[in-house]
């Protein structure tokens, strides 16, 4: 059975989800039948076709009134600000991928279900009272049929959690700190402009900008045992895509650099194949653009101090990798069945 999907919010993640669907070979399993986005159809089609980070979309894109043609596929377009106006029941929607960045509460998920959707997947952490938070590759096996309102966590959580998981299983993590070196985002101004966060008043292309992050809380949501054992900070840098994460952990077992890198290499070709990758090439951020993995560890940057303090550099395409995980989690949700 093909899963009938609607995308609510067709910004950076929404568009990348659709592009990833067409590039990943999952179209026999997932069909996007509707998109809800306030922008007009011409703008939707243009930004789907032409992308400053990911280049031109290979499929033909046409607009016929409020039908978006992607190759031979016709996708209904809606422009509603209120979930209550969306015809999910009429369209037989199995899963809504809410990529708006606006909605994320249980009430928001219930609103989609009230309109006829069977399940909802949010593209950000959402509130703590959702049915489940999934980091694909780590805990998707915990999904149950009754989990109707689910979060796909965040791009940085998807990046770091698999690495934490493998290191904890192998070496026993005691505590850790995380520094996210994140590409600029569209909540930052091109030139200085007002914002309640005074650092975010500053031009995105001119500075390295510290911002708040809830990544430590995201780690705890997946691994409750690490409550008060991880801290995180984040800075935005003047690039438009790809993020690096500096992960430092203290571990119980004595280790060296070779131990750490062997673990990651083995995991990348085994339990975390397709989720984690490993490289020792002299690469820079742009080389990871359009990489579908959740995390790519640069083994040349692994450090160990005093046998118990590990530092690793982990890359991710914060758009493309996460968009691919949205598709994976959609399939995992559908595999549990629909009520």
From Swiss-Prot:
Gene Ontology MF terms in the entry: erythrose-4-phosphate dehydrogenase activity; NAD binding
Transmembrane residue ranges: none
PROSITE patterns: GAPDH (PS00071)
InterPro entries: E4P_DH_bac (IPR006422), GlycerAld/Erythrose_P_DH (IPR020831), GlycerAld_3-P_DH_AS (IPR020830), GlycerAld_3-P_DH_cat (IPR020829), GlycerAld_3-P_DH_NAD(P)-bd (IPR020828), NAD(P)-bd_dom_sf (IPR036291)
Primary enzyme class: oxidoreductase
Keyword Oxidoreductase: yes
EC number: 1.2.1.72
HAMAP family: E4P_dehydrog
Entry protein name: D-erythrose-4-phosphate dehydrogenase
Gene behind the chain: epd
């Amino acid at each position: 059975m093909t899963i009938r999907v609607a995308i609510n919010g067709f910004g950076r993640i929404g568009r990348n989800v659709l592009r990833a669907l067409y590039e990943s070979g999952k179209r026999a399993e997932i069909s996007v039948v509707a998109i809800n986005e306030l922008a007009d159809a011409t703008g939707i089609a243009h930004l789907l076709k032409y992308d400053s980070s990911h280049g031109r979309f290979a499929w033909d894109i046409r607009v016929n009134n409020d039908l978006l043609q992607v190759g031979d596929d016709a996708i209904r377009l809606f422009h509603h600000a209120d979930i209550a106006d969306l015809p999910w029941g009429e369209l037989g929607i199995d899963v809504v991928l809410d990529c708006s960045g606006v909605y994320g509460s249980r009430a928001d998920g219930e609103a989609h279900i009230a309109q006829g959707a069977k399940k909802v997947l949010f593209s950000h952490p959402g509130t703590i009272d959702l049915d489940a938070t999934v980091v694909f590759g780590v805990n998707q096996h915990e999904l149950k049929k009754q989990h109707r309102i689910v979060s796909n966590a965040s791009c940085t959580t998807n990046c770091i959690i698999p690495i934490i998981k493998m290191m904890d299983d192998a070496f026993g993590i005691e505590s850790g700190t995380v520094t996210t070196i994140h590409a600029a985002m569209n909540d930052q101004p091109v030139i200085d402009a007002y914002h309640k966060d005074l650092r975010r008043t500053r031009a995105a292309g001119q500075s390295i900008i510290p911002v708040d992050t809830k990544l430590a809380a995201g780690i705890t949501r997946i691994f409750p045992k690490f409550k008060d054992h991880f801290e995180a900070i984040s800075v935005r840098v003047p690039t438009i895509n790809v993020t690096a994460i500096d992960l430092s952990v203290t571990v119980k077992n004595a280790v060296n650099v070779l131990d750490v890198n062997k673990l990651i290499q083995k995991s990348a070709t085994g339990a975390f194949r397709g989720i984690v990758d490993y490289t020792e090439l002299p690469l820079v951020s742009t080389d990871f653009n359009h990489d579908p993995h959740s995390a790519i560890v640069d083994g040349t940057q692994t450090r160990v101090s005093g046998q118990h303090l590990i530092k690793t550099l982990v890359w991710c395409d914060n758009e493309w990798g996460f968009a691919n995980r949205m598709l994976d989690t959609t399939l995992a949700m559908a595999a549990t069945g629909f009520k």
